Amino acid sequence: MFNEITKSVTWNGQVLELSTGKIARQADGAVTVKMGNSVLLCTAVVANKAKEGIGFLPLTINYREMAYAAGKIPGGFFKHEGKPSDREVLVSRLIDRPIRPLFHPAFVNETHVTCSVLSYDPETPVDILAIIGASAALSLSPAPYLEIVAASKVGLINGEFVLNPTLALLKTSQLDLVVAGTSDSVMMVESEAHLLSEEQMLEAVKFGFESFQPVIKIIKELAEEAKKPKLEMQALYPASLKKEIEKLFVKEIEQAFAMKSKQERSTNLDLITEKVFTHFVSDIENKKYSHYQIESALKAIESGILRNEILEKNRRIDGRSTTDIRQIACEIGLLPSAHGSALFTRGETQSLVSTTFGTSLDEQIVDSLEGEYKERFMLNYIFPPYSVNEAMPMKAPSRREVGHGKLAWRAINPILPNKVQFPYSIRVVAETTESNGSSSMATVCGSSLALMYAGVPIKAPVAGIAMGLVKEGKNFAVLSDILGDEDYFGDMDFKVAGTGEGITALQMDIKISGVDFKIMKVALEQARLGRLHILEQMNKVISKPNNELSKNAPSTTTIKIDKDKIRDIIGPGGKVIKEICETSGAKIDISDDGTVSVYASDRDKLKVALDKIKAIVVEPEIGEIFNGTVVKVLDSGAFINYVGNKDGFVHISEVSGERIETVSSVLKQGDIVKVKLIGFDNKGKAKLTIKNADKDKFSNNTKPKTSVNNTKDNSEPEQRHDSSKKRAWNEDNNAEIAEVITERKYFN
């Protein structure tokens, strides 16, 4: 029934298996990828006819993580997979980027690739397996997929490169790098790094490139046995068409490219495009030329003009040399109500960035195959249509926005303080207000400025730069700080972010084959010099974090209590903690280990909440004096609330130094009296005395101690209760609280 074909290779100590012919047999290409306990199904479907009237490849990549793959049922009201998560979007883009440049340039058939995780093993990198599976499925399909791609993940642990590190190993790794490519070229790099040098990054890319070569071999073997006939493709456009357009319009196009303003240049190129289509309108109607052929020929002419100016004259369309950086302007604190803000402008690219502090309750909850976890740092990249002068409605975040935001997140994350140094959650919003190339790197620069102005103790300022490449044969030029047109017509988009010491993020997309490590080395060094120049300009405005937070920032502190006291603070059904929050206006977050984080809009509200928590968790010591409130009077004595929610009993003999006939003759409900704790009965109930209490040192204003460091003392039976639970506060915590509340400063 099944004609299954399987190829396998031992890769990094695990067997990687690719098979086809058993599952999804009606798809143009279908490959099952297995490694460890991970199983992915990758399919490729190609439309029979080309899509008319478009000038790009309509390729859609969908990566899906099925909940059942990890033995889970989806959360939420509807118990099924919903819209793609950010991770699914990011992996979809990761698959798309190395694959898209490898199709025949004239191919415009609708193409869909789906990669589904059916079984999940945390010991295997499923994103890498998805890239491999997608490439294999396309190699089996009729699509004119010209070369085969594979990928690998690289970590750096204890100075050694690690191939396909597990999630556990990545937590201790200085590098998380994905590299994809063909048998002779790197096509894509995506990484987060902890201040690594250019040499280390280049060696990591080489290591990853060499590591996936055995995988390319088995994909080729599978394709040789199971591939379907490829679609026959013609030239993108007739050579005669290009010659005719050049003859009629090349001078006008050259004049348009001589205009340094993006708006002016774009307007004139649009007018020329209209003229070209008007000239060929009869040819389009007679189907001599298609709309796509004319557009492609025109773009080829524009590309040739731009590339020739760079390679032959070392001159770019805005007049810069290949290494020049556009003019930079930085401004901080321009949004008075934000906790931190900055405006970063580089040429015609501009990013308005704001920073907001929140509580641990504001952290982003992420539900993934690995399990649920929280992100305390969030970065949202927004690219509104007005930034490129387009009249379009605002929509939900696009895949591009999610991807650019994650790249900026990777650049900033390594230099952030940990939660002990800075207990807030952090949200950065970067809105691209103008765009002409490298808006994601403008986001990195603006985010660094806004964070420092907000008072976040980052390790060092971070800047980012986008590099480009123009290559013809052996002749090439690496471009610093590329424009949008240079990105579109160029051969590489190479983004590098980092501090003065090293790289924190790197993303590279190459559109052609033959880009070797020599070119990458030149690009990395040129990017380093450009990054240092940008940092120099940024440092003129702000070079280190402000010592104080914004007056609009919330106050916060973190204390430690006995885990046994957690239930007392929460109360039945959350009654107690809800009452504290409502009366104080603060927010409280309690961890299972007894860590209590308190947040409020100002220090007065914070103090109210802390006092209420203190009253609940305090464990008084024998001999302490308190202001107590009489809650009930009996013939034998009285119950008195002496601290927090704790009541003690005063026997009639302890009410007064003189003999009294009745307790009610001395005490009434609601009376406030000084009481002294003299011990506990065999049930742990407090025993109090009023006699001579006002003659002893009053202890209500002393700093109570926490019950974190419990010790047991069996010297006296009456003290067993007290010795098992010391006071639930400590002076170290109080000293820290005083500093945090009054100074609101944080140090590394």
UniProtKB/Swiss-Prot annotation:
This enzyme's EC code(s): 2.7.7.8
A Gene Ontology term for the protein's cellular component: cytosol
Record field: compositional bias (Basic and acidic residues): 713-722
Keywords: Cytoplasm, Magnesium, Metal-binding, Nucleotidyltransferase, RNA-binding, Transferase
Cofactor(s) named in the record: Mg(2+)
Reaction equation(s) it catalyzes: RNA(n+1) + phosphate = RNA(n) + a ribonucleoside 5'-diphosphate
Subcellular location, record wording: Cytoplasm
Molecular-function GO terms, alphabetical: 3'-5'-RNA exonuclease activity; magnesium ion binding; polyribonucleotide nucleotidyltransferase activity; RNA binding
The UniProt record lists the keyword Repressor: no
Annotated stretches, region: Disordered: 695-733
NCBIfam families: polynuc_phos (TIGR03591), PRK11824.1 (NF008805)
Protein name: Polyribonucleotide nucleotidyltransferase
Organism: Rickettsia rickettsii (strain Sheila Smith)
Taxonomic lineage from the root: Bacteria, Pseudomonadati, Pseudomonadota, Alphaproteobacteria, Rickettsiales
Gene symbol of the encoding locus: pnp
